[in-house]
Curated annotation (Swiss-Prot):
Family to which the UniProt record says this protein belongs: Belongs to the RecR family.
Protein species of origin: Levilactobacillus brevis (strain ATCC 367 / BCRC 12310 / CIP 105137 / JCM 1170 / LMG 11437 / NCIMB 947 / NCTC 947)
GO BP annotations, alphabetical order: DNA recombination; DNA repair
Name of this chain's protein: Recombination protein RecR
Keywords in alphabetical order: DNA damage, DNA recombination, DNA repair, Metal-binding, Zinc, Zinc-finger
CDD domains (alphabetical): TOPRIM_recR
SMART domains tied to this protein: TOPRIM (SM00493)
ZnF (C4-type) residues: 57-72
Cross-referenced InterPro entries: DNA_Rcmb_RecR, Rcmb_RecR, Rcmb_RecR_Znf, TOPRIM_dom, TOPRIM_RecR
UniProt lineage: Bacteria, Bacillati, Bacillota, Bacilli, Lactobacillales
One of the Pfam families matching this protein, by short name: RecR_C
C-alpha cells in the first residue's frame, strides 16, 4: 500500500535524521499527524527558527545566535586553555560539569578515511590560526572521542600543534574505548580532564 503524498514526504523527512529508519520514521509521521495542530505549528516554527537563527561562532565553531558565542566573548574564562571537541553538543556536556573554565574549539567531526573525511574537511585551519594569533594560549586539551578516528585525529592535531611550543594534552581514559563524550557522566568527565596526559 502506498501512503498519501504528505505522509510519504513526512516519512522521507524523518528518515534524513540520524538513527531513524523506515519503521521509526513511519511511527513519527503518524504521531505527528495525531498531534494537535498548535503543537505541530510550534514544532515547525522551532525547527525553522533553529535553522534560521543559529550559526557557527567564527572563533571556536560552537553553535550560537550571536558572534562570537557567549563562551568566546566571556573574558572571565581562562584564556590559556583550549579544549578541542568533535561537535558542539560536546561543549554542552563539558559545561554541565562546571569544572572546566577555559575556551573551546569545535572540529565538526573527526578524520575518517572510510567516510572520505580528511583534515581539510574539519575546523582545523581556524584552530591553528587561532593559536598563532593568540600567544596567551598555553595548552590545548584534545577531547575527541575514544574511537579509532578520534585517536587518529588527536595524534594528527598533536603533531601539528606541538612544534609551536604549545602544550598538548589528551583527556585521561576514564572514558572507555569507543565511547562518546556525550554519554559520559559528570564525574567521569571531571576525572578525565583532571587526569589528562601530555601527548
Amino acid at each position: 500500500m502506498q501512503y498519501p503524498e504528505p505522509i510519504a514526504q513526512l516519512i522521507d523527512g524523518y528518515m534524513k535524521l540520524p538513527g531513524i529508519g523506515q519503521k521509526s520514521a513511519t511511527r513519527l509521521a503518524f504521531f505527528t499527524i495525531d498531534m494537535a495542530e498548535d503543537d505541530v505549528t510550534a514544532f515547525s516554527k522551532a525547527l525553522i527558527a533553529a535553522k534560521r537563527d543559529l550559526h557557527f561562532c567564527s572563533i571556536c565553531g560552537n553553535i550560537t545566535e550571536g558572534d562570537p558565542c557567549s563562551i568566546c566573548a566571556d573574558k572571565t574564562r581562562d584564556q590559556t586553555h583550549v579544549l578541542v571537541v568533535e561537535q558542539p553538543k560536546d561543549i554542552m556536556v563539558m559545561e554541565k560539569m562546571k569544572e572546566y573554565h577555559g575556551l573551546y574549539h569545535v572540529l565538526h567531526g573527526v578524520m575518517s578515511p572510510i567516510e572520505g573525511k580528511g583534515p581539510e574537511d574539519l575546523n582545523i585551519a581556524s584552530l591553528i590560526n587561532r593559536l598563532q594569533q593568540n600567544p596567551n594560549i598555553k595548552e590545548v586539551i584534545i577531547a575527541t572521542n575514544a574511537t579509532p578516528e578520534g585517536e587518529a585525529t588527536a595524534m594528527y592535531l598533536s603533531r601539528l600543534i606541538k612544534p609551536a611550543g604549545i602544550k598538548v594534552t589528551r583527556l585521561a581514559h576514564g572514558l572507555s574505548v569507543g565511547s562518546d563524550i556525550e554519554y559520559a557522566d559528570e564525574m567521569t568527565l571531571f576525572k578525565a580532564v583532571e587526569g589528562r596526559t601530555e601527548m
